[in-house]
Amino acid sequence: MALILERLYLLSSPRNAIIRNTRSEAGRELIFSFGLPSLSLPSCIASQYGKRRRLYFTTQLHVNSFLHWTCDANDAVNITLVQPDEQKLKTVSSFHPQFTYPIFGDDERIFGYKGLIIRLRFAAHDLRPQLHISYDEKFKPVEDIAAVDIPKTLKPWIPEDAFVTLPDYEKAVLEDKAAKDFKPPGKLVHCYVSRNRNFEIWAGSLADPEVRRLLDRAQIFVSLFIEAGTPLATDDPEWTLQRWTVYFVYEIVKPPTPTASKYSIVGYATTYRWWHYRRDRTQVPVVKNDPFPSGPEIHPSQLPSRLRIAQFLILPPHQNSGHGRHLYTAIHSACVQDPSVVELTVEDPNEAFDVLRDSADYHILRPEFIKHEVNINPDPYEAHSRNQRPRRVPTAALIPVKLLHDIRTSYKIDSTQFAHILEMFLLSQIPLKNRHAGGANMSRLLIKKHRAEDPNERRYYWWRMLTKQRLYKRSKDILIQLDLDERIQKLEETVSNVEEGYEVLLKEFSEREEKLKARGVVESPAATVSDDASAGPSGTSRDQRVKRKFTVEDDEDKVEEEDTAKRTKV
């Protein structure tokens, strides 16, 4: 139905209209619902008057026509990697962003265009950018109503050299004589072959101007593909930049022309060194009143640190091909080889990255666990005290605590992450028939507990107790607020969710090993991670996520989440 609105007054009444505001950097919207199909109009065509919230429209518009001037930003933005060909640019790959809300607002809508295409071109080797905007028709300004200024909106997100004309950009890429000799900045740290294609991983300090220039060009990918991701500030003091290391993944391709580069970007990651205080307990502290000495200059790389992965991205055309595991393994190897690094951590990982990380760490630690015959002791008590009710979990009698601590510190894995991998391995050592996934009799286990006749049933019982113990310590502040019965129920539910997630990964690992045995292929532990465990936005492994988090929700939390959540974080 076409409505012509001319100097129309609407009274904000529950019977007449319901008004809801949504905020957006590109413009706010007022959503009207008054018995007719919902209409969406920009707030710039309405003005509010008085306490009665009367809306006064100053122009005539066909509302149905007006809605045709908005488009989905995710569909409008098109990212293209290009290489020089004989006469024109050759498209290597083209894809759309996963998110655009940091740039165009929470609604991810752009007003004022029909047939809009925002094409972001990047040279495949050095990411030289170019912004090109095309459309079929643009909204003509009516008073203060105008189409979104796209170049102005994108200016804070892309380098200045992206605002060149398409002919100038094509000429610059086609005539780039330096492309033939291009090498990624930094040093080569890892090479590998995947699906008969060659790849390299390069690492360099952010204090290097070439690394910084390449990262500046890639920064917009953070906002387009990493949920709640924040671009790095590359204008910090040099001593801060020295704490950052950037890893670039490149594919070695056949150059389309003699002057073209053989490198094509696949993804990148950034790591940051956090200072770690390690108290020297071998010496007794002594107070000295001597003047403060002016010692030699200390470089950040010489200080004890925790290495934290801040950003980790494989571009969509290369996801689900195993590049994420190779990149993570390269970072972990550098961490182990650096004597100043205490452990490797990850900044706010999503569940997709958790899958990749669990897969990589499991295959790194599994040979070490097997070597030392790590398993749960089914009889932690003496024979005469087995019938007594235990007052606490005998952790030291169940697993070799000192040995596991030494393994963790030697591989520099975060304590929480190490606990996940250990639980997964210990679960794999229990026969499937004695686990819940294999049809174990849980009722009998709850009755028999550690007094069960089968040692594997006792191992499974103690595995659940060890996992509950870790979950309770981690979520103690939440659990102590619950009644005892509800506390026990929440722990049981969470342990079952954790076990279910482990079973998914263990099944995937087992199937992969069977395929490799059938093909007669022997791979190194770091290379046996599933190719599907990339940190991308989609894939089989992300459809069956590892369930780790312990949450307690009430009705108010659910209502608030439904009202405020734009999208589910992954």
Swiss-Prot record:
GO cellular component: chromosome, telomeric region; cytoplasm; nucleus
Biased composition (Acidic residues): 553-563
Alphabetical list of InterPro entries matching this protein: Acyl_CoA_acyltransferase, Hat1_N, Hat1_N_sf, Hist_AcTrfase_B-typ_cat-su
Gene Ontology biological process terms from the UniProt entry: DNA repair; subtelomeric heterochromatin formation
Keywords: Acyltransferase, Chromatin regulator, Cytoplasm, DNA damage, DNA repair, Nucleus, Transferase
Residues annotated to bind acetyl-CoA: F312, L313, I314, Q319, N320, S321, G322, H323, G324, R325
Region (Interaction with histone H4 N-terminus): 106-108, 272-274
Residues flagged as site, Interaction with histone H4 N-terminus: W244
Keyword field contains Nuclease: no
Molecular function per GO: histone H4 acetyltransferase activity
Subcellular location: Cytoplasm; Nucleus
Catalytic activity line of the entry: L-lysyl-[protein] + acetyl-CoA = N(6)-acetyl-L-lysyl-[protein] + CoA + H(+)
Record EC number: 2.3.1.48
Coiled coil: none
Active site: E347
Record's keyword annotation contains DNA repair: yes
Superkingdom of origin organism: Eukaryota
Residue span of region Disordered: 522-570
PANTHER family linked to this entry: HISTONE ACETYLTRANSFERASE TYPE B CATALYTIC SUBUNIT
Summary of subunit composition and partner proteins: Component of the HAT-B complex composed of at least hat1 and hat2. The HAT-B complex binds to histone H4 tail.
Family in the record: Belongs to the HAT1 family.
Cited function: Catalytic component of the histone acetylase B (HAT-B) complex. Acetylates 'Lys-12' of histone H4 which is required for telomeric silencing. Has intrinsic substrate specificity that modifies lysine in recognition sequence GXGKXG. Involved in DNA double-strand break repair.
The name this protein goes by in its record: Histone acetyltransferase type B catalytic subunit
Organism whose genome encodes this protein: Aspergillus fumigatus (strain ATCC MYA-4609 / CBS 101355 / FGSC A1100 / Af293) (Neosartorya fumigata)
Lineage of origin: Eukaryota, Fungi, Dikarya, Ascomycota, Pezizomycotina
Gene for this chain: hat1
